[in-house]
Amino acid sequence: MSEFILEMRGITKQFPGVKALDNVNFKVREGEIHALCGENGAGKSTLMKVLSGVYPYGTYDGEIVFKGEVCKFKNIKQSEQLGIVIIHQELALIPYLSIAENIFLGNERAKKGIINWNETIAQTKKLLQKVGLEESPHTLVGQLGVGKQQLVEIAKALAKDVKLLILDEPTAALNEDDSENLLNLLLELKKQGLSAIIISHKLNEITKVADSITILRDGKTIETLDMKHDEVTEDRIIRGMVGRDLTNRYPARTPKIGEVIFEVKNWTVYHPIYSERKVLDHINLSIRRGEIVGIAGLMGAGRTELAMSIFGRSYGKKISGEIWKNGVKIDVSDVSKAIANGIAYVTEDRKGNGLILMEDIRKNITLSRLGKISNHFVVDENQEIVESERFRDQFKIKTPSVFQKVEALSGGNQQKVVLSKWIFAEPDILILDEPTRGIDVGAKYEIYTIIQQLADAGKGILMISSELPEILGMCDRIYVMSEGRITGEVSREEATQEKLMRLMTKTAIQEGA
């Protein structure tokens, strides 16, 4: 029997006007963790969709050999029956069902159409123990954090007798502790004989867990690296991904910082459902003209709640405090008023809240300010095309046409469309919530350049990020949050990862001590 559990030979996949995969060869050894790297749009997800049957046999050229047998999958069910299970970046769990119901949904423990709940619960307990979860099988999935939901997804895969587990950006939405737990679980499952493919832009995680790394660029296989025998560094992986040396992760910049243009004063917000729970407690911060201000904090610190509540009170209840712009108190009591006052918010969830995926690039970009391209309440379509093409060219959005649906774009290009949409609204204050989440290093550099250009044009930038190197590399000044409070303010010159982490873990009790 071959040492390879999977061989994909000469895989070519075309879409109208685009060759997404071009004669790709990809092999995975039995019992290894194999990382798949590449820029957004390199073809990683397309290759995995070919493998799992999302793109059925006949819609691509090439051959798939799994456990020595040639496979012609017509759908996901067929690939899962052989033990190939994919966990997508957007988790496929139902929040209002229990853990047990989610794990065995479509794979029920039933006889003559009647579910055996005793067996279901017993097997769920075993699976939860295997992935390190102590929750009850009856717990609703919606009550779990994202990190634990990822573990439920893995338990669901194990319930299907998985032989090859595919993880697409498994830690993109996780904090450091949850990421560490998931990676340790993956290593433990490897010891038990599981083979895995991991797609991730977090190169430090890849080099930690992977046995082999295959790099794709522009739909082609560039190289496969063996972690034991090849000299593998993050710089080498990046060079393979982008086709050049990326000596600096962050563009060089000499900031031109002016006067204070935006202030948040004594901003307090309560939870929208649990009305006695204070989510933000007397937040005070300021942004100067041309300044990039960072917000650092662990998950649950209140960073996104702060951003959304400032942006038209789109989160929270019993909100008190004041927002000042250019020395004048402004009304941000709803989103339209926030936009009218020159505030824009780039959400952390671009697919869920930032874009209309079924619409084209043109309509997504101009949506934030239709009045700018309208005459007597009628949209001037020619002007709409001109404006959207201007942003496409300026931000190098990779697309054959502004009429292309946004859902067909890579993550990096989708993020450029979101940024274009809000820049089209001509804001003075731009709030960026995880602006490079799920984006490769090359596209990140382009996004960083756009952010710096906005600051250089005199905009005030409030940037939220869970990646401390990103905060340190991009921001002129940093506020740190913990438990809904600001626990420190650090200048760029004073900031270190250690100092930020100390402030991120500071509790109200410690502050009062």
UniProtKB/Swiss-Prot annotation:
Keywords: ATP-binding, Cell membrane, Membrane, Nucleotide-binding, Repeat, Sugar transport, Translocase, Transport. It is found in: Cell membrane. Its main location: membrane. ATP binds at residues 38-45. The keyword Transferase does not apply. It comes from the Bacteria. GO terms for molecular function: ABC-type L-arabinose transporter activity; ATP binding; ATP hydrolysis activity. One of its GO terms (cellular component) is plasma membrane. The keyword Transport applies. It is an enzyme of class 7 (translocase). Its EC number is 7.5.2.12. It catalyses: L-arabinose(out) + ATP + H2O = L-arabinose(in) + ADP + phosphate + H(+). It holds the Pfam family ABC_tran. It is a peripheral membrane protein. Residues 6-243, 264-508 form the ABC transporter domain. SMART domains: AAA. Belongs to the ABC transporter superfamily. Part of the binding-protein-dependent transport system for L-arabinose. Probably responsible for energy coupling to the transport system. NCBIfam families: GguA. This is L-arabinose transport ATP-binding protein AraG. It comes from Geobacillus stearothermophilus.
